[in-house]
Amino acid sequence: MPPLPRSQFLETRDGIRLHALVWRAGEVHTDRVESPVVLLHGGGANAHWWDHLANALSTRQPVYALDFRGHGDSEYPESRHVGAFNDDLEDFVGWLAREDVILIGHSMGAAVALDHASRFPATRALVLVDLARGGNPTTGRRARLALSLRRTYRTRAEAIERFRFLPESSHASEALRAVIGGQSVREEANGRFGYKFDPAWFSLPSRPRPDLAALLCPTLLVRGSESLLLTSDAALAFAREVATARLVEIAEAGHHVLVDQPERLLAEIASFVATLPAATNSSSS
């Protein structure tokens, strides 16, 4: 049986309690200094969306999956501001005391990872899984609208049964949907059951895009071949603009590549990481 993650909590600069899952920190012994991997979920998701991938990623280095504020088992603050998730990641990397992280983000998490790497050149590598760019605006608006509505259910079982990926996924297995759904439900104060994210975050405007010219680390952009949120043209334009970027497209996958084709995604990440130069222990000051 693969090892289970442990939970870790830390406090941000503004006093918010963040939760992260940790795989094998302090247990990996190799003859190389390996950078920590930090997994970043998309909007309305949580750290457990990475459970089925994290053990395979943690064979040579520790792996952390962060719950952004207002998501998962992190604190749900009353006040919200643009850039809060970016601050969460910056504080988390500071807590790790290692700047040379390998950031792997999906959707919103990819956008946060991209922003961080463009501002912190010690970032060792970046994997952007279906970063939303140039996609169908109607699909994007519908997904944001659906996420902005708070739905609750009478029982936990009903909430798990009604759990869906947004945008809808036609390739994810029913078993994986149910497992992630089970990790995405929480009991509300009124005794009903809802999902582990605060819908109010989806009414905020987007943070300005980072300067891609400032991105220096090796970067892998992964596009689902059927994605409606990252077009082929936008992915190609990104790869042309970022000198350190490599683009791969995974067949039979939509926006949620990590649940549609997890084994293929793992293979692409492993191939990419194998090309990285040897790490050095770059500690935060």
At which residue positions do the language-model features occur?
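Active-site loop/oxyanion-hole signature of alpha/beta-hydrolase fold enzymes
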Residues: R13-I16, L21-E27, H52-N55, Y64, ...
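Gly/Ala-rich beta-loop-alpha elbow adjacent to hydrolase catalytic centers
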Residues: G105, G109, A113
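Alpha/beta-hydrolase fold catalytic core
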Residues: M1-V37, T59-Q61, R98-E99, A270-S285
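Serine-hydrolase catalytic-loop signature spanning alpha/beta hydrolases and amidase-signature enzymes
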Residues: G42-H52
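Conserved serine/cysteine hydrolase catalytic core
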Residues: E187-E241, E249
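Catalytic histidine-centered segment of alpha/beta-hydrolase-like enzymes
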Residues: A253-P262, L266
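Conserved alpha/beta-hydrolase catalytic His-Asp/Glu region
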Residues: R154-D211
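Flexible "cap/lid" loop of the alpha/beta hydrolase fold
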Residues: L114-D115, R124-R156
